[in-house]
Amino acid sequence: MGFKSGVVKCFFLSLIILSVGCAELTSLREEKVLMTQRIEELQGENEGLDSKYATSEEENARLIEEKNRLEDAQRSMEERLKGTGVSVKIKEGHISVVLPSSVLFNSGQIKLKKAAKNSLSKVCRILEKDFPNEYIRVEGHTDNDPIKRTKQLYKSNWELSAVRAATVLHYLIDNCHLDPTKLYLAGFGEFQPVASNKNKISKKKNRRVEIVVLTD
């Protein structure tokens, strides 16, 4: 009995050990599967990051190229517009030709000065040559002085700025070989100042018409 009992005990002990070993093996296999899955996930995430980095690098290169192109265009236009009283700036990623109201109009008026037509003719030639197919927005801007002398004509600076923008737009349509379906105007009144409006000099800077070339 003692011998048989010992054999039985050994048998069951072997089964227990085998069972434990199998369980551990199964657990290790499951851990390996999970680790493999996690490695694959990390590899996928890494590839995604590489792709995003490459896209970011391409976008940065594109932005630098666009910035250089705009700055080259700005310098070229400024050189050709010397002596006209007209300036050129980069505005929200677009070329903007800035025409002071003092160059274009007499005080409170909407009729173009004779000298203004000479300046606008030069602007026309540049737009025809450099931007024949671009959309163009003509913007009117004023200072913050309320309308007084011409109150019967213009209820507010919005109306005055819009009418002055329209005057310039009509000149472009009549004298430039530009597609009129790609030109439009906006009157901003005093609400997009470029200076403080605290004195005559800053107010003069705010009274302007801008021709914005909406390049892609």
Predicted regions and their residues:
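Bacterial N-terminal signal peptides that target proteins for export
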Residues: M1-F11
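C-terminal motif of bacterial Sec signal peptides marking the signal peptidase cleavage site
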Residues: L18-G21
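Short, solvent-exposed beta-strand/turn patches at coil↔beta or beta↔helix junctions
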Residues: I64-K67, E92-S121, D143-K155
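Extracellular/periplasmic catalytic domains that process cell-envelope and extracellular macromolecules
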Residues: V88-K91, S119, F131, L178, ...
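Periplasmic OmpA-like peptidoglycan-binding domain that tethers envelope proteins to the cell wall
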Residues: Q109-K114, T142-D216
